[in-house]
């Protein structure tokens, strides 16, 4: 009988004792023979560590000295983790015993597969996909992310339409399976992101290194969503800032020269629309994001990316304009957009 590859499931925790109490036991019940479950704690101020040591002393805990966010926290924690595969799992994700094997089977099917995700359904409405990744992430030519099963805030019911194994652009950070050597080769997440869209940036860089990103349709998990960082101006700021930084760094200059100005204009429109509709925190968040990007450029914090390719040559890229397809043409689902998008 062949030995199963070692898998380390790493949960990054920040003041998530209530999530650990609710979901950690399910992770420990995973049906996989070569598994280590690790909790990396991002300097929590609640009783997460005390509770784990009392109720789950067998779980290895990696204590980080400060809250380094999702990106920096995982970068630090994974330096202390061994395994063929890492599975980065949010603490607010519920799993069933058989969730992991389909992910590993997908990864093992081809050595060029660098990362994969399961189908992610909503914990509170289980017939629907969940916002953060749904059945696998795509991106359009302006850098707007969407997913099979979720376009902007329009979320589909899971009727089995995305149960296949298929290449995508990005795998969700809510449940991300990645080869440990691929993570190291890509030099991990960009810690400057802190949180939000760091997994899209990483998957983009993995594709530039020649890896494929997959959705493993036979694997299914349930995600509460928004379990760590509350909705507000900071969340908006991080999303807008990180998206612009990702585009600035990963696009070849021939595309960067027109994509960034167009996105800048569209972001300004989005900011004023939010303000006129009474969403002042969103307006402030977008404004702060743009000032932060200017500071990022001036400070020279960007990392040089080798082997840049035109975005449309990568997998999981919609060559049309998502905002036009969605708002002007009325295409609300992934299938409609990919089938009819221009």
What are these regions (language model features)?
Residues 63-81, 91-93, 102:
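Glycine-rich, basic loop-to-helix element that forms the pyrophosphate-binding segment
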Residues 86:
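Short aromatic/hydrophobic "clamp" motif used to bind/position activated sugar donors
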Residues 21, 46-54, 63:
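Acidic helix N-cap motif at the loop->helix transition within catalytic regions
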Residues 1-29:
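N-proximal low-complexity "stem/linker" segments adjacent to membrane-targeting elements
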Residues 10, 209-328:
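Active-site-adjacent helix/loop segment of glycosyltransferases
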Residues 94-144:
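Conserved donor NDP-sugar-binding/catalytic core segment of glycosyltransferases
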Residues 26, 33, 41-50, 66:
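A conserved acidic beta->alpha catalytic loop
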């Amino acid at each position: 009988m062949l030995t199963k590859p070692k898998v380390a499931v790493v949960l990054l925790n920040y003041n998530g004792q209530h999530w650990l109490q609710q979901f950690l036991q399910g992770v420990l019940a995973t049906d996989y023979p070569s598994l280590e479950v690790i909790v990396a704690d991002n300097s929590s101020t609640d009783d997460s560590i005390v509770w784990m040591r009392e109720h789950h002393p067998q779980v290895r805990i990696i204590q980080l000295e400060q809250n380094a966010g999702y990106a920096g926290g995982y970068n630090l924690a994974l330096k202390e983790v061994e395994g063929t595969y890492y599975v980065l799992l949010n603490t607010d994700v519920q799993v069933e015993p058989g969730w992991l094997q389909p992910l590993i089977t997908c990864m093992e099917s081809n050595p060029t597969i660098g990362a994969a995700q399961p189908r992610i359904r909503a914990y509170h409405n289980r017939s629907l996909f969940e916002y953060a990744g749904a059945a696998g992430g795509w991106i359009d030519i302006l850098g707007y992310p969407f997913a099979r099963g979720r376009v902007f805030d329009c979320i589909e019911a899971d009727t089995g339409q995305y149960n296949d194994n298929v290449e995508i652009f990005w795998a969700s950070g809510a449940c991300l399976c990645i080869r440990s050597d691929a993570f190291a080769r890509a030099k991990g997440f960009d810690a400057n992101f802190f949180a939000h869209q760091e997994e899209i940036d990483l998957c983009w860089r993995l594709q530039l290194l020649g890896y494929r990103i997959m959705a493993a349709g036979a694997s299914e998990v349930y995600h509460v969503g928004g379990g760590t960082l509350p909705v507000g101006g900071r969340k908006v700021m991080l999303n807008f800032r990180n998206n612009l930084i990702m585009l600035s760094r990963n696009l070849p200059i021939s595309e960067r020269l027109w994509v960034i100005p167009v996105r800048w204009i569209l972001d300004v429109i989005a900011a004023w629309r939010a303000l006129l509709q009474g969403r002042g925190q969103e307006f402030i968040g977008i404004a702060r994001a743009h000032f932060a990007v200017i500071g990022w450029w001036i400070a020279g914090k960007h990392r040089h990316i080798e082997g840049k390719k035109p975005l449309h040559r990568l997998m999981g890229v919609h060559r049309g304009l998502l905002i036009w397809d969605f708002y002007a043409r009325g295409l609300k689902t992934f299938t409609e957009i990919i089938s009819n998008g221009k």
